[in-house]
């Protein structure tokens, strides 16, 4: 029997079973009616949506969910300039201390209530309690008040150059605007309801953690007139439903895209791209033009990396190409070399001081290590084997350090365990660590304030807890400076100090491709996957 | 017999109690702090501590255990640390796919493996026997995910008969259900089928050498009758034990199969929860799994009566 005939027999027998079963027929009819009338974008997201509160967690998946449901006061455009989004406009007083922000008309929440200045104030305050940049803004904020229904007044205690950059922050935590009743939730407790004023509505009934998340077009949303550009401009929902279907297995997700079961695969594995690209109906594009930065972080509390010379030795012992070939492989998706701590292609790109990273010099590294007084003690590198990007960085670092004579032990674990272990401040032999690998999206690394891996405020700094007053002074000077050219000069001075101090090794800049079928039109180029502007044919 | 069943059911209580204590201790003593994971990269120690406090993780272990146990006795398994959804609701969402996958797998596996095992024993030493045993070795040795990928490649991509992934509830659409469940059930069934076929063959071989089988043949009974009515019935006790024990194997395979075919079942829920140290969810699913396993063992013990009238409870 030919295969098609066999398939027919199968289909027919299946149909017979179905038609003889009233429940199935009723089910089929019920399912057919709404779906046929709707346009649906089926997406395989990079992770499962576990938390619905984008202020409570910094997880990128929750941030992406946030952008569908919530709106922001200001937003970053593709020129990396901050534009008004929910704000109609703003005025700054002559002394630069008072910002008066007016809200657009026709802003409404998904529960039907209007967006008011009070909602904005409560939302900014909650975000300011959690987010690093928000906390900095709150420190210089004298008052934040709702002057009337549509006007918010922010008064500063001292000049601050990053007010709009903070309120228009594009990555986690994004200052999303929620109704006051939700924004009054303790910042350390998750909100219990998802009500935003964004272009899509969260369909709570259809949310199945570990499986699917569904968003429906919010008909009352009024987009801005400007064309969409990064997070700014008109957020026009061109599909009725966006369905996130979490498929944990990369091979299965690729096959589902090839079979047309899904339309958009956010982060396909580079190894499987040749298979996906073999189908001409699938586009593979680097949607995020800014990319991602690999990071090798030291623990500054314990030898040997409490000594600057040991960190410099490590930097001379490695080169970015080794990392990139190990974790990405295809040179089409990474920069040959990027010496900028604040990303290549960003507004603060410079390669000042990056010689150690550009060239590998084992002899120099050995000499520096000796100068540091390294006594042969064991160096613990945390190795999250379930995340290829992190695992590859650990392996490359371990080999490079062994090459210069360090006694290295890789400690294999899963990512969740690593995120707990890196917070441990005890000595490496007592459950602590010396080195851990991670990565940051460029959107987080673009300037000295959002790039928390350069912060050097000691115990209150990011894991590893480096302390360097000069770096902190330069970061504060950058935040206070309102002149863009002067900010650039500060960054150059800062980067020279960073290469001397080595808070971490930037292991390279790489780009994550996204794959989507050719029935998907209007995918925006942006550091965050946005789902407005997209239509499905 | 009813007294026996009641006694066995009562015996599950201390067993479940032990499982509960063991699971709780194991989870809380293993590394991984959900508060740190939730707090993310930007949080300071004070914030992490506040989250820990909000989740009740700062209390001494026995207090946490007591709280969990009291809630559990009232039918409340707590809430997921991450999604905030009740564990009972999460498990409820996931029971059907896993139950259906396991049932379909058992139906396919048992209905294929027992006849294959019987035929292999009947035709022992011939090419039929060797072919069945080769298949069994293949099913047993090839990892579940490889079989899954091969079936996706063949059944979905090349022939286009079945969808690559996902699940449709049987209550929503029977054709949808059947098309979604076939490949996963075959995948998961491979190892199970191999196990049952080998066991059936081995026990049948033993039984076929018994005197009463020879007598049956001597009486002039048809081969089919001898094999099915006389030999197989007596071979069923060890076979049903294998079927029961094999369910443990299935539970392990379910996790992989559900991941490969993106089926939102209990296996995936367990893996996701373990990777994030979502304590209440892990505790909940392990309790459900062990309870099912204990019940299943009881069920298997009861089926012995059907096959061997000498057994009395």
What are these regions (language model features)?
Chain A
Residues 207, 514-537:
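Long beta-strand-rich cores associated with HINT superfamily self-processing modules
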Residues 200, 333-371, 385-392:
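Structural transition elements
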Residues 102, 136-183, 188-208:
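Surface-exposed binding/hinge segments that line
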Residues 305-346, 392-393, 498-506:
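Periplasmic-binding protein-like
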Residues 88-133, 145-147, 153-155, 253-256, ...:
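Aromatic- and charge-enriched surface segment that lines or borders ligand/interaction sites
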């Amino acid at each position: 029997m030919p295969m098609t005939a066999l398939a027919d027999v199968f289909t027919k027998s299946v149909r017979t079973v179905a038609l003889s079963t009233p429940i199935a027929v009723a089910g089929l009819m019920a399912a057919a009616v709404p779906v046929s009338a709707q346009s649906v974008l089926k997406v395989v997201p990079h992770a499962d949506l576990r938390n619905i509160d984008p202020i409570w967690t910094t997880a990128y998946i929750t941030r992406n969910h946030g952008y569908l449901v919530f709106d922001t006061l200001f937003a970053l455009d593709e020129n990396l300039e901050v534009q008004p989004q929910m704000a109609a406009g703003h005025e700054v007083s002559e002394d630069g201390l008072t910002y008066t922000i007016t809200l657009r008309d026709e802003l409404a929440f998904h529960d039907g209530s209007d967006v008011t200045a009070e909602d904005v104030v409560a939302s900014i305050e909650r975000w300011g309690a959690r987010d690093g940049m928000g906390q900095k803004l709150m420190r210089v904020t004298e008052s934040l008040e709702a002057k009337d229904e549509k006007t918010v007044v922010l008064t500063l205690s001292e000049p601050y150059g990053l007010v709009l950059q903070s309120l228009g922050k594009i990555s986690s935590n994004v200052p999303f605007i929620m109704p006051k009743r939700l924004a009054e939730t303790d910042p350390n407790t998750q909100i219990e309801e998802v009500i935003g004023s964004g272009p899509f509505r969260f369909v709570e009934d259809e949310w199945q953690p570990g499986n699917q998340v569904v968003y429906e077009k919010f008909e009352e949303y009024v987009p801005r007139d400007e064309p969409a550009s990064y997070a700014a401009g008109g957020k026009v929902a061109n599909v009725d439903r966006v369905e996130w279907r979490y498929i944990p297995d990369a091979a299965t997700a690729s096959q589902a895209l090839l079979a047309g079961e899904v339309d958009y695969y956010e982060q396909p594995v580079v190894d499987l791209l040749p298979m996906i690209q073999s189908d001409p109906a699938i586009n593979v594009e680097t949607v995020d033009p800014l990319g991602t930065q690999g990071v090798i972080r030291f623990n500054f509390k314990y030898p040997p990396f409490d000594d600057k010379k040991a960190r410099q030795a490590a930097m001379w012992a490695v080169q970015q190409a080794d990392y990139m070939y190990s974790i990405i492989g295809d040179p089409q998706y990474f920069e040959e070399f990027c010496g900028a701590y604040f990303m290549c292609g960003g507004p603060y790109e410079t390669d000042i001081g990056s010689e150690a990273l550009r060239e590998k010099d084992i002899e120099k590294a050995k000499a520096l290590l000796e100068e540091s007084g390294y006594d042969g003690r064991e160096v613990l590198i945390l190795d999250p084997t379930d995340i290829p990007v992190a695992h590859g960085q650990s392996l490359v670092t371990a080999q490079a350090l062994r090459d210069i004579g360090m006694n290295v032990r890789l400690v294999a674990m899963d990512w969740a365990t690593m995120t707990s272990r890196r917070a441990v401040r005890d000595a490496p032999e007592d459950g602590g660590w010396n080195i851990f690998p991670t990565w940051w999206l460029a959107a987080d690394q673009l300037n000295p304030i959002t790039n928390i891996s350069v912060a050097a405020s000691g115990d209150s700094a990011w894991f590893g807890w480096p302390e360097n007053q000069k770096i902190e002074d330069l970061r504060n000077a950058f935040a206070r400076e309102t002149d863009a050219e002067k900010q650039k000069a500060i960054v150059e001075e800062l980067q020279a100090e960073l290469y001397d101090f080595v808070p971490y090794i930037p292991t390279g800049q790489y780009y994550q491709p996204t794959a989507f079928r050719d029935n998907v039109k209007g995918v925006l180029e942006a550091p965050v996957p946005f789902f407005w502007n997209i239509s499905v044919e | 017999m009813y007294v026996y069943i009641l006694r066995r059911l009562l015996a599950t209580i201390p067993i479940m109690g032990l499982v509960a204590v063991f699971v709780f201790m194991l989870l809380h003593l293993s590394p991984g702090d959900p508060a740190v994971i939730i707090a993310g990269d930007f949080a300071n120690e004070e914030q992490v501590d506040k989250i820990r406090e909000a989740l009740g993780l700062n209390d001494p272990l026995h207090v946490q255990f007591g709280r969990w146990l009291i809630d559990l006795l009232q039918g409340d398994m707590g809430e997921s640390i991450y999604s905030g959804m009740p564990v009972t609701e999460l498990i409820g969402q996931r029971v059907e796919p896993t139950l259906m996958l396991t049932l379909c797998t058992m139906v396919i596996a048992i209905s294929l493996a027992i006849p294959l095992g019987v035929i292999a024993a009947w035709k022992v030493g011939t090419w039929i026997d060797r072919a069945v045993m080769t298949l069994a070795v293949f099913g047993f040795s090839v990892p579940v995910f490889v079989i899954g990928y091969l079936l996706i490649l063949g059944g979905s991509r090349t022939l286009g008969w079945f969808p690559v992934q996902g699940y449709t509830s049987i209550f929503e659409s029977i054709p949808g259900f059947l098309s979604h469940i076939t490949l996963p059930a075959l995948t998961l069934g491979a190892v199970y089928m191999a196990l049952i076929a080998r066991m059936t063959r081995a026990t049948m071989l033993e039984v076929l050498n018994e005197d009463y089988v020879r007598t049956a043949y001597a009486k002039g009974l048809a081969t089919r009758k001898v094999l099915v009515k006389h030999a197989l019935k007596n071979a069923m006790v060890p076979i049903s034990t294998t079927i029961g024990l094999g369910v443990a194997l299935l539970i392990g395979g379910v996790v992989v199969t559900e991941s490969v075919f993106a089926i939102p079942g209990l296996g995936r829920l367990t893996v996701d929860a373990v990777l994030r140290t979502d304590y209440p969810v892990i505790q909940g699913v392990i309790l459900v799994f062990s309870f099912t396993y204990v019940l299943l063992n009881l069920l298997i013990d009861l089926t012995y009566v059907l096959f061997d009238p000498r057994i009395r409870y």
